[in-house]
UniProtKB/Swiss-Prot annotation:
Cofactor annotation: FMN
Annotated residues for binding of substrate: K81, N126, R127, L128, G129, N191, N196, N258, T259
Gene Ontology terms for molecular function: dihydroorotate dehydrogenase (quinone) activity; dihydroorotate dehydrogenase activity
Record key words, sorted: Cell membrane, Flavoprotein, FMN, Membrane, Oxidoreductase, Pyrimidine biosynthesis
Organism: Synechocystis sp. (strain ATCC 27184 / PCC 6803 / Kazusa)
Taxonomic path: Bacteria, Bacillati, Cyanobacteriota, Cyanophyceae, Synechococcales
Name of the protein described by the UniProt record: Dihydroorotate dehydrogenase (quinone)
Assigned protein family: Belongs to the dihydroorotate dehydrogenase family. Type 2 subfamily.
Subunit structure, as described in the record: Monomer.
Length: 381
């Protein structure tokens, strides 16, 4: 049945192309139904997902920050904004999942349409605006989930500033969300790089960033791993400053990268849903167009740190080759979202199986041995 579904997946993508946000909402609702069925004693749906989409390989397991990752491929933030399908992501093969972005205050996000697929470019343009129900609502939802399910994969939460919060009050906003959600998650990512919250990306290059890091660490009584997610559009100099701040404030890692506001080289010239030139459309671009830049940023961070700061690599991962490239550049972990949309849920097991083949071909006994091998010995850029 699932093989038949895979053959139909391109048709499903085509049917949902005109309103991808509604299609995504239906996906999340379907996964919620699987969760509900499991809680009500009908475990067969969850078991079928596990059989179809998981790929166990001890060579791909990682231990980091005191957490055990069944494999190195995780779900990127932006997919499960509310944590509604948190219990189901392990059955779809992910080694970890990052929920959110979540803000202190509930917010509706930007006006629709705000999510667009660019199939010619294997990309997605989004200007959702961190629509979510707020930190308190997510905490209650996740507590209810974990009261029923034991966590089998690490769960991260992407923290973003509320739109209504002034930039000079960002510290308190992030700290509130962190303290509210710390009991129900394993690691946290400070999102200062989304292009869809006005002024947010300016925090990456302002005096507020060290204050945010310091405020979060002061509140981190749980000793949760704190990471920062950066933009692919930053200069090398700006990235170097962030690396220094990560070291100074003892952050646990860097997520590289978020979406891009650049539009160069796209095959899509006009956005069909609006009729406007793509260069004039606001939002963050993800998928294949940012693959190479994301890898360059990973390589730069690895070079500058000598591999001492774990990197979660994200941006344009569609195949095992894409994943392997980022591992070799210096990523210890990977995240996928746009590639999962275009390739379907089979992509996770395909990539994991392909990584295992890469390890065998290269004579590696474990994925950690391959991290940064294409970067080691090269002079920093």
């Amino acid at each position: 049945m699932l093989r038949f579904a895979r053959s139909l997946y391109p048709l499903i993508l085509s049917v949902t192309k005109s309103d991808p946000e509604r299609g995504h909402q239906r996906l999340i609702q379907t996964l919620k139904k699987v969760d509900t069925m499991h809680r009500n004693g009908f475990a067969v749906a969850m078991e079928q997902l596990e059989q179809a989409f998981t790929h166990a390989d001890p060579r791909l397991q990682q231990t980091c920050w005191g957490l055990n990752f069944p494999n190195v491929l995780g779900l990127s933030a932006g997919c499960d904004k509310e944590g509604e399908a948190a219990a189901v992501w392990p059955a779809l093969g992910f080694g970890f999942a990052e929920l959110g972005a979540v803000t202190k205050y509930a917010q509706p996000g930007n006006d629709r349409p705000r999510l667009f697929r660019l199939p010619q470019d294997q990309a997605v343009l989004n200007r959702l605006g961190a629509n979510n129900e707020g930190a308190v609502a997510m905490a209650a939802k996740l507590k209810h989930t974990w009261d029923y399910y034991p966590r089998t994969i690490p769960i991260g939460i992407n923290l973003c500033k509320s739109k209504i919060t002034p930039l000079d009050q960002a510290v308190e906003d992030y700290v509130f969300s962190f303290q509210t959600l710390a009991p129900v998650a394993d690691y946290f990512v400070v999102n200062v790089s989304s292009p869809n919250t006005p002024g947010l990306r300016s925090l990456q290059e302002s005096d507020e960033l060290p204050r945010i890091f310091a405020g979060l660490q002061s509140a981190n009584h749980w000793q949760k791993p704190l990471l920062v997610k950066i933009s692919p559009d930053l200069s090398w100099e700006a990235i170097a400053v962030i690396i220094d701040l990560v070291k100074e404030h003892n952050l646990s890692g860097i997520v590289a990268t978020n979406t891009s506001t650049r539009r160069s080289g796209l095959k899509t010239k006009i956005l069909p849903q609006t009729g406007q030139p793509i260069e004039q459309e606001a939002g963050g671009l993800s998928g294949q167009p940012i693959r190479d830049r994301a890898t360059e940023v990973i390589r730069y961070i690895y070079q500058q740190t000598g591999g001492t700061i774990p990197i979660i690599g994200v941006g344009g991962i569609f195949t095992a080759e894409d994943a392997w490239e980022k591992i070799q550049a210096g990523a210890s972990f990977l995240q996928i979202y746009t590639g999962w949309i275009y390739g379907g849920p089979w992509v996770v097991s395909d990539i994991l199986q392909g990584l295992g083949e890469k390890l065998a071909a290269g004579g590696f006994s474990h994925i950690s041995e391959a991290v940064g091998i294409d970067t080691i010995g090269k002079a920093p850029e």
